Amino acid sequence: MKRYLAAIILFFLAAGFPAFATCTRIKPVDHGCDACGAPLNLGNIGLMNLRYQPAGTVLARSVFQVVPAVKNADPDRVLYECDLADKDQLFEVFATNGDSNVGGAWDMGNGYFQTYFPYTALKLVHVRSGKPFTRIWQKVPLTQYEIKGNKIEIRGRDFSPISAELIRTDKNNRSPGYNTFGCSSAAADNYTGAYNCNQPNGYVVFMGPGMNVPEAGQDSWNHYDTWGTGRYMAFGMNTAPVATLTQNMTQGCRVENYTANVIFPGISINALNEGHAVTAPLTITLACASETENLSGINSGQLSLGFQPSYAAWLQVQQLGLTSGDGLSRYLVSDHYDSQPSLAKGVGIQLQTSSGQPVSFLSWSSFSGNAGWRPVLEDAQAISGSQQSDEKLYQRRFSARLTKLPGQTVTAGQVDATASILIRLQ
C-alpha cells in the first residue's frame, strides 16, 4: 500500500513540472577560439597627443554581427533547432573576455575596457537590449529566429548586432589578468603596428533547453564553463582584418567650435517634388598644430575629417536602399524616420564642401579604409584668434541641403537628424 501511494505521489509531482524539449545543434561550428570569430572592422587606429585627442575622444566605432566569422562565413547557416513551444526559453548570454587583461578584465570607466593598444579602451553594446558588455555574463531573450512548422531554427544572423566604440584614454591598466595567454599587458606606450595579442574582446553564447550556460550571472574573470563545448562565438580587434595602430604625438587637429544645430527654412511638399531644395550653412573651427597643412589628406599617416550619422539614421538609409556597397550614403535622414509620425518622410540632407564637392556620410559597418573621409583642411581658411603660439585656427564651411530622396514620396513634418564630426589619423 505504501509503495502504491508513493508511486502515485511521484507521478503527480513529476507531472507538475513543465516538460521542455532539448534544443539541438544542427551544423556545429566552433568560432569561439581566439582568432576564429568575427572582426570589429575598426581599421587603423591613430593616436595623437592629448591636446588634440582628450581622454574620451572617439577613435573608431562600428556595428557588427557575430556571423560572418572566420570559422563561419554563412550568416544563414542553421546553428540550433528548438521546439516552437520553447520560444520563451531562448537567450543570448554575453560578456567581455574577462580573464584577459587586454580582452575585457579592466573597466577604465563607463564600460570601456583596456585593450592591447596603449591608451585605448573599448566599449561593446548588445544593440537590441542596449546593455553594455561587462565582465558579468548577462542574458537577454533571443527573439529573432526562423519558424519551420513547429520548430525554431536559429542562424548566425539571428543574434543581435553589437556596437563597438574605441576611445582615447589618458592612462593604461597593466595589472595582470586571471590568465595571460601570451599577452602579459597592454603594448608599450609608443607601440605601432598590428593588434598582435591574440585575445578576443568578447563572447556571445546561445542558451536554451538542453543548452545550459552555467556561467550566466557569473564573472567572466574566472567563469567560462561553456567555452570547451565549442558554442562560444568570439569577436575582437585581433580577428582578421586585425586593427592596426599609428601614432603622431607632435601634430594634430581638434574641433574647437562648430554649428551644433543646422536650421533649415520651411519648404512646401510641392516645391520638393518639383526638385527644389533649401540650404543652410555648417561651419567648423579647427585648432591644429603648426604645419599640419602638410598632413591634411586621406592616406596613411594623414589627417582626415568625416561625418558619421547616428546608428539609427544609418539604419534608416540602409532600409531605404540609399547606401553604397561600402555602407556610405550621400543622404542623412531623421534618426527615427520610420517610427515618429511627426517626422517628414521622403526627405534627406546632403552635404558639400565650400568648393562644391559632395560629402558622403560614413558607414557603421566598417571603419576600415578611407572611403568617405575628406582631408582635414580641405578648403579651410586660416583665421586669427589662436591662443597658442604653436597652433593655428582654421575655418571650414559646408553647405547642408534639404532635398527629396530619390524614389520616395514626400510627406509633411519635421526633420531631426544627427551626425558626429570625427577627425582621424589615418
Task: Give the predicted meaning of each segment.
Residues 4-13:
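Sec-dependent N-terminal signal peptides
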Residues 20-426:
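Mature extracellular/passenger domains of Gram-negative fimbrial/pilin and adhesin proteins
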Residues 2-3, 404:
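Basic side chains
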Residues 14-18:
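N-terminal signal peptide c-region/cleavage motif recognized by signal peptidases
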Residues 1-2, 23:
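N-terminal hydrophobic targeting signals that begin at the initiator methionine
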